[in-house]
Amino acid sequence: MAEANKAVFRILIAGTMEAVFRELTKTGEPQGAVFNAVLTLDSPGLVRGRRMQMRTGSGRHAIVVGEVMELEAPTRFAHTHRFTQHDDPSCTVVYDLKKVDGGVEVTLTVENIPAGTKTETEMRRGGDFILKNLKAIVETGRPPLGTRLMYAMFGALEFVLPGRTKSENWPL
């Protein structure tokens, strides 16, 4: 469902709140649900106000920069989000988890999407992808085969990322 500057994605995952929340907030290792990026912080501990990046597995490129806005384990995680390869303004990503019959309802809301930008295109396309991968990881222990193959290509082709995404250009 989409609004002018907002997109909402929802999925039911057969798992625990803690397992889902851990996948969304783990640091120092690839997040299979989020394009296999590594959530990297300016200092240990995921807390409000902490600067963060989503980096490639090698750590050489920062794909997203942002700041933790809210963290209420295991029900809510919100952060600002700005793609380093675009000159677009930040948006806000919010994950809300709710225990329901059959598991956990996960709602991914992207707010303040800059209209008419590359960020808008990518955020509207990425929500379902992230949630479907999150579901597969929590329920089966790994992303679907197609996603795993795509991630292997990401690693092999990291050298084609724009120079502006190099982590050294985005100090924490």
Predicted regions: what is each one?
Residues A14-E18, M69-T75, D96-E105:
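A short, structured loop/turn motif at beta-sheet edges
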Residues T25-K26, A73, E139:
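Residues at helix-coil transition
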Residues T40-R82, S167-L172:
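Glycine-rich portal/gate segments that line the openings of hydrophobic small-molecule binding cavities
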Residues T80-A136, L145-L149:
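Beta-strand/loop substructures that line and gate deep hydrophobic ligand-binding cavities in soluble
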Residues V20-L24, P30-Q31, V68, F77-H79, ...:
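Hydrophobic pocket/interface hotspot
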Residues K6-V8, H61-G66, D88-V94:
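Short, surface-exposed coil-to-beta transition loops
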Residues M1-S43, E168-L172:
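Hydrophobic ligand-binding cavity/cleft-lining segments
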Residues A136-L172:
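Short, highly charged C-terminal tails/helix-capping segments
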